[in-house]
Amino acid sequence: MFQNEVTFNEDMGSQVYLDYLYNFDPLKDFFELSPWQESSFEKQAKKLQEREANRRTFRNQLTLGLHNYHKKFTDNPKVYNTIELLNDPETMTVVTGQQPGIMTGPLFAIYKIITAIKLSKKLSKNLDANVIPIFWICSDDHDFQEVNWLKTVDHKGEQLLYEIHDDKEGFSIGDRDIKHKSQDLLDKLAQQLQDSPYYDKWMTLFSKTLEQSKTLADWTAAIILELFGNEGVLVIDPMKPVFRQLSKPIFSKALDLGEGLHNSIDSQTEKLNNRGYSGQVDLRVNHSGLFYYYQGIRSPLTVEGDQFLLANLGIEKSKEDLVRELESDPAKFSPNVTLWPVLQDFLLPSLAYVAGPGEISYFAQLKQIYEQFEIGMPVIYPRESYLLLESDVKSILEKYQIGPENIFYDWPTTRKRVFRELAPINTEKVLNDTCRTIKEEHEKFIQELSRLDEKIYDFEEKNFHLIYRQLYYLKEKGDQYFRRQQLQAQRDLDYSKIKIYPLDKLQEREYNIGEFLCKYDSSVLKKLLKTPLNPQKISVVDLE
């Protein structure tokens, strides 16, 4: 029996991430609160209460905006009851987020939501308050190559890649119409998944949600609400006009800060580097923290003094011009990776943010920005990681006495051990030793028979050759069986590797929840939700 939890190692995350999980003290100066102390959540809740008392919230506008936004995707009363809870000044949120993706994107996006749900329930109980999980869809992002793909594995163990293409260079994901191309992808994917027991149910759902969507952001929101609406999950797409309008104070403050924003990032990054860590965020020089939409293109807005520049286009803008445009049309502005966390924690009563490994690294660079905007950084809580273990893969692991930890930590050594154990003998040596022994006995036998007639020696060599041929035949049969075992072992090991640790990446980064839903129905989500909350280990989830 193998381990049901696996510890992260240096191949699975940066040193910042590993220390955040297992050795927090060296990082405590870069975060306001530790995720490993229950008192951190109490402190953040108290800060949110003080903020509420100072009326620095937008609950009425937020709930109205959320109500109108969700109407497009769902009529689930649980969703609207949850939205109404946000009107209560004591209601808090656990936020997580990710770029939209095909059928929600890689598994880790789903794991973020699962973690947020479980953490919300735990904090609701511990703090005796309503805590709501919210998924922030990073629809502003314009790196389409990060989200335009889906991977699966065929029955031969070959990884298959499905992609949608779009030639709108520089356009935000939330501005790209992908409906027809995504339906084409689903049609191609059908050839791979159509024999799965729950294929019809889930492909109907994916097609239905796509039909009511235009962009990947809408499709992602629709699927998330289908999967987790009953768990109280809400979704925010910051590109929608109501949320852009509410974002104006943050955008305005960024314009006022000018060079101060990227200076604070540089300062915090230098401190991080001096502690022996590497920063995750590598910004363009003089980045203002904002992007500006020009004819649909999301262009970085750099700043020098009071002069701003659309960096990719060479267009200059004065601060006064930008302030006027922000007031009249906030949809022209978009936050960069350093500003969107501040924005979401400005809009929402964020008790905690569920972050992936890379996000934790760049949150370590953001403390001064939070201070500049006078917004408290919430508890940064690591998202959970899972290994979904299918029955065919489990059988292979048991057959060769391998655990997932062997695949993660010492795969070359494990492979050698398996093949060594497959061949407990050297057939050539066994044949030679056996022939030597038989030859000796054969000579004695001939010698005894020669007492009857010495002509028997005439048959000695031919007779032994016949014996040798039979022994050699058996040896060749043994080699044939071994080669067959080797070939099967090769296939088995390659298959288990590409399912568990494809291309030396965690499963969660390569595969999609859709395949598992088609195979195992919603039981896969139920198992994840029942798994005890533990972001410090990779939990092995048996799907049998």
Swiss-Prot record:
A Gene Ontology molecular function term of the record: ligase activity
Top-rank taxon: Bacteria
Protein name: Putative cysteine ligase BshC
HAMAP family in the cross-refs: BshC
Coiled coil, from the record: 431-463
Cited function: Involved in bacillithiol (BSH) biosynthesis. May catalyze the last step of the pathway, the addition of cysteine to glucosamine malate (GlcN-Mal) to generate BSH.
Enzyme Commission number, as recorded: 6.-.-.-
NCBIfam families, alphabetized: thiol_BshC (TIGR03998)
Record bears the keyword Coiled coil: yes
Annotated organism of origin: Natranaerobius thermophilus (strain ATCC BAA-1301 / DSM 18059 / JW/NM-WN-LF)
Family of this protein: Belongs to the BshC family.
Gene this chain is encoded by: bshC
Transmembrane segments: none
UniProt key word Coiled coil: yes
Disulfide bonds: none
Alphabetical UniProt keywords: Coiled coil, Ligase
InterPro entries reported in the protein's UniProt record: Bacillithiol_biosynth_BshC (IPR011199), CC_BshC (IPR055399), Rossmann-like_BshC (IPR055398)
